[in-house]
Amino acid sequence: MANIIPKIAIIGEGVIGCTSALQISKAIPNAKITVLHDKPFKKSCSAGPAGLFRIDYEENTEYGRASFAWFSHLYRTTKGSETGVKLVSGHIQSDNLESLKQQQRAYGDIVYNFRFLDDRERLDIFPEPSKHCIHYTAYASEGNKYVPYLKNLLLEQKIEFKQQEVTSLDAVADAGYDVIVNCAGLYGGKLAGDDDTCYPIRGVILEVDAPWHKHFNYRDFTTFTIPKEHSVVVGSTKQDNRWDLEITDEDRNDILKRYIALHPGMREPKIIKEWSALRPGRKHVRIEAQKRTSVGNSKDYMVVHHYGHGSNGFTLGWGTAIEATKLVKTALGL
């Protein structure tokens, strides 16, 4: 495209939208970028996670590697109280040895100090340990700090944020944008109009008052504790294809029962916050460029799809945004 000042719309102000906006602003400094979002950030899927670095699928390893380098940079150069990024160690337990070996293949050479615990360590540390356990040290990026930090960087660059509902990519293009970056998360497929593979993964977490708890601990990826700055995140539910967000007594009792089994010394924890969200489930992250023509004004425009990160948005977002930015540059002929 030949515009001297390209107009780019990014749909979504969660971790994927803000990361994309920051990457694009660095790569195309003369672009006029607008971030469109349909609700306040506090109601988004990015507001609650503790953001522990962990990769579910080996196909995403290199995206995670790029993100890890970014978190390392932030950790070295900027206060964690501003970025929400901190270094934390912990464990993942499972009776399924292959699932832990898959974790090793996905990110064992990215994080620090990755190793399997021996029997003495397992029995000393955990009251009822699983058969196998890994240990590693990595970065965690608290959503309620990390994403606002990214947004502040964008606002300093005069990037505009607009709260408006987006139901049509064509309508955004007809408003004058040359490239649209679809970071709509769970609704990315519906907005694209050609993807029915996205599905909700209902997640519920509790935040408890346990300042002495300094290490993360997982059991089979659904039961976990992750320390934040002023609380400990306890979770979770991972319920596919459920759209309801109300937190029930069944949710609380189930999570706390599993939590106390991991940490019997922390019975009757003081719950200081609850949070639920719908994670954007998809078999693979979609990073793809498409040329389209709007129905209304017959305008040619480009869409770059960037959604479907599941539970790994914070871990993969910086790396996938690098790839999405390359597609934006190509779409603009740069």
From Swiss-Prot:
GO terms for molecular function: D-amino-acid oxidase activity; D-aspartate oxidase activity; D-glutamate oxidase activity; FAD binding. Coiled coil: none annotated. FAD binds at residues 38-39, 46, 310, 315. GO terms for cellular component: cytoplasm; peroxisomal matrix. Inhibited by thiolactomycin. GO terms for biological process: aspartate catabolic process; D-amino acid catabolic process. Its EC number is 1.4.3.1. PANTHER family: D-AMINO ACID OXIDASE, D-ASPARTATE OXIDASE 2. This is D-aspartate oxidase 2. It comes from Caenorhabditis elegans. The gene is ddo-2.
